[in-house]
Amino acid sequence: AYAQWVIIII
């Protein structure tokens, strides 16, 4: 569970 805010940053 790490691509839950990374997607928003990218």
From Swiss-Prot:
GO BP term, example: killing of cells of another organism
Signal peptide: none
Keywords per UniProt: Cytolysis, Hemolysis
Subunit structure: Monomer.
Free-text function comment from the UniProt entry: Has hemolytic activity against bovine erythrocytes at nanomolar concentrations. May play an important role in the initial phase of fungal fruiting.
Family of this protein: Belongs to the aegerolysin family.
The protein's name: Aegerolysin
